[in-house]
Regions:
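N-terminal hydrophobic/helix-forming segments and targeting peptides
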Residues: 1-238
Length: 238
């Protein structure tokens, strides 16, 4: 991967994009593909499609979803803590102690999902905080009024976890599911244009996959492709 492609991947991974709030990531994707795509279009649902018009009759679509799992603020307590609910399939067993970033109209607000110190836990009692809705987020607010000055109910949030390079060519980070997919779709389109393929190629970035493939259902009725390749991540079980 050259430096330009790496920079594009880093931009996608650093841009918050929880389901239903994909606009920032889609803007970054559109800005990139607009430098080489012949056409770039969006639909009413928020999906983005960049196209190379081939001279032949065949067409393919390469798709990925732009959204990621996250949270949404559901309430604010009198003590100034936030209650959150999952957006998509967030795992409650790993959320406690996780730093998060709440996306507000005024900009990001940092917080952490509270974790009871091991010294204070009642190990004989059932652990109710395995439910994300029972967990608290501390943003440093002294009380409810102070918290409401910073955050509103309904604001989305994401884990505040960045990109880390592992050994070899592997990486770990937030949002690889599925910024990797829309990165691949853009790269396939770029290479198709470089080679001036006769096949028409659509690169597609869809929305709200984590909520039930909602964006893909809509865009699937808009693109008349002979074949569709959906790119997504899967379990590291090999």
């Amino acid at each position: 991967m050259d430096s330009e492609r790496r920079e594009f991947l880093e931009t996608l991974l650093s841009t918050p994009s929880p389901s239903g709030y994909e606009t920032p990531a889609l803007r970054a994707w559109i800005e990139y593909v607009s430098t080489f795509a012949e056409t770039v279009e969006t639909d009413a649902y928020g999906n983005a499609v960049a196209t190379h018009e081939g001279k032949g009759d065949l067409s393919i679509a390469v798709t990925g979803h732009a959204d990621e799992i996250g949270y949404a603020v559901s309430s604010i307590t009198e003590e100034g803590f936030l209650r959150i609910i999952p957006v998509g399939g967030s795992d409650p067993t790993v959320s406690r102690g996780t730093p998060i970033e709440i996306q507000t109209a005024a900009g990001p607000v940092d917080g952490v999902i509270a974790q009871t110190a091991i010294h204070l836990r009642d190990r004989t009692a059932p652990d109710e905080t395995t439910d994300i809705a029972a967990q608290h987020v501390d943003i440093g607010a002294e009380d409810e009024a102070a918290a409401r000055d910073l955050v509103e109910v309904g604001d989305p949030a994401i884990p505040a976890i960045g990109l880390t390079d592992l050994a070899g060519s592997r990486i770990t980070g937030r949002g690889i599911d599925n910024r990797a997919g829309i990165w691949v779709a853009a790269e396939v389109l770029r290479r198709a244009i470089d080679r001036d393929l006769d096949v028409t190629v659509h690169a597609v970035a869809t929305v709200q996959e984590e909520l039930g493939l909602k964006g893909a259902e809509m865009v699937g009725t808009e693109i008349d492709a002979d074949a569709v390749i959906a790119v997504d991540v899967t379990h590291a079980s090999d």
